């Protein structure tokens, strides 16, 4: 009888609606991931007329600022155990901070006269810094909150699917609406009107997703689910982070894997990269961007099912390694096809021409390699997130301390620092081909017209 009680109480299972709704928190923050990291350099240089070098470096610089805020907020979360739980306050407050800062940044700072350029620089930096704090508040909950949601090894792999669905609702919605909205403004992505419209759209989507995520974790966000000794709060000093990393080998390996996945995603979905690929190279941004984006999502569906099945049978580590390998092989194939590319000949992407369907062998091969590669990669991109909960459980087992905030922000710290390099990598690559600024929608339209 005693054994049965212990066994039953040791497994914390989530209800279906909780597994579905809580991961929408990641979708809510991914709205801002696209809204800020994909466009803020263009906004700073084209709308506010700031130095392009300054605007680009700020993307990396603010990620370094995240290095300071992450451990502080993680420690603060682990000390929080109030009336509204441990995670819900950070989710709501973080989202409101981001909404306010982005609304002011994108809608009000362009009003500052060009003669007060110093004020523009100061406002840009200050509002960007405030946004970073809000972003850290909310993103840390996605990783940390899983520890209270479920510890069932059969359920945790399912988090990847629902997390990706949430990401699609957030990131996918922004990637879908952005080019549509850009067409309505002269200057496209470089116009102030584009940002004034896109910001409120993103904020509304993010708030709705956050509210649903709060509902998902509401029942679980209480002390009885806070691991061993959940009634007490852990007071871990920031300097103890080093010892935690040093003694938690699984967390070390997960940081490397997760950071690599995020860096690859950030580069692959960068607006400049997509504009150069579909617009400058293939000469048909409007006809290729959305179809290829949808194609990648369609190919990812079977891989989601495969990764979950493999995770439940062989473990999440084995699943991650297997399907990332598939993605790597396919992306090598994409690279070879791009090296063979030639404008105006058979080695170029072509889906719809002037006379209707115009698919060639090059396009078929590109679709196969890109589709399978993107599908396999996208299905594994969020797998490190539920694995953070496993590392947190291991830390509780190893040291007896329930510190999900610290574990989540440790992972997030490395994840953000590495992914922030994407803007730098793209910027360096662009400079090598002789461009002085990111490719905008206007630039590629002019390029297509003259081609």
Please provide the spans of the model-predicted regions:
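Membrane-embedded alpha-helical bundles of multi-pass transporters/translocases
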Residues: 2-445, 450-451
């Amino acid at each position: 009888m005693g054994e049965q009680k212990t066994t039953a109480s040791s497994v914390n299972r989530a209800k279906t609606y909780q597994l579905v709704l809580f991961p929408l928190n990641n979708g809510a923050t991914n709205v801002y991931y696209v809204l800020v990291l994909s466009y803020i350099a263009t906004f700073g240089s084209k709308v506010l007329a700031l130095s392009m070098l300054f605007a680009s470096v700020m993307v990396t610089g603010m990620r370094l600022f995240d290095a300071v805020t992450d451990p502080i907020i993680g420690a603060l979360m682990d000390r929080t155990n109030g009336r509204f739980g441990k995670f819900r306050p950070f989710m709501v407050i973080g989202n409101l901070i981001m909404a306010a800062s982005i609304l002011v940044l994108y809608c009000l700072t362009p009003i500052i006269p060009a003669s007060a350029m110093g004020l523009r620089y100061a406002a840009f930096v200050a509002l960007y810094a405030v946004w970073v704090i809000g972003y850290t508040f909310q993103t840390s909950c996605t990783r940390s909150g899983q520890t209270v949601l479920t510890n069932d090894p059969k359920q945790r792999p399912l988090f990847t699917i629902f997390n990706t669905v949430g990401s699609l609702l957030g990131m996918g919605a922004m990637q879908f609406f952005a080019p549509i909205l850009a067409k309505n403004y002269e200057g496209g992505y470089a116009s102030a009107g584009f940002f004034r419209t896109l910001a409120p759209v993103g904020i509304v989507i993010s708030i709705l997703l956050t509210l649903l995520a709060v509902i998902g974790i509401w029942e679980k966000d209480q002390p009885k689910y806070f691991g061993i000794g959940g009634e007490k709060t852990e007071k871990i000093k920031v300097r103890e982070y080093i010892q935690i990393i040093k003694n938690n080998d699984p967390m070390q390996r997960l940081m490397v894997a997760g950071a690599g996945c995020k860096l690859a995603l950030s580069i692959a979905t960068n607006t400049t990269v997509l504009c150069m690929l579909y617009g400058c190279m293939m000469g048909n941004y409007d006809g290729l961007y959305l179809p290829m984006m949808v194609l990648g999502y369609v190919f990812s569906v079977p891989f989601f099912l495969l990764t979950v099945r493999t995770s439940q049978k062989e473990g999440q580590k084995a699943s991650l390694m297997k399907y990332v390998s598939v993605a790597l092989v396919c992306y090598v194939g994409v690279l070879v096809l791009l090296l063979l590319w030639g404008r105006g000949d058979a080695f170029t992407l072509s889906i719809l021409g002037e006379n209707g369907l115009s698919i060639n062998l090059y396009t078929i091969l590109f679709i196969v390699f890109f589709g399978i590669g993107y599908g396999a990669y996208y299905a594994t991109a969020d797998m490190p997130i539920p694995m953070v909960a496993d590392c947190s459980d291991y830390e509780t087992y190893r040291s007896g301390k329930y510190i999900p905030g610290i574990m989540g922000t440790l992972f997030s710290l490395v994840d953000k620092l590495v992914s922030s390099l994407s803007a730098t990598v793209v910027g360096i690559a662009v400079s090598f081909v002789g461009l002085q600024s990111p490719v905008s929608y206007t630039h590629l339209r002019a390029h297509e017209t003259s081609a």
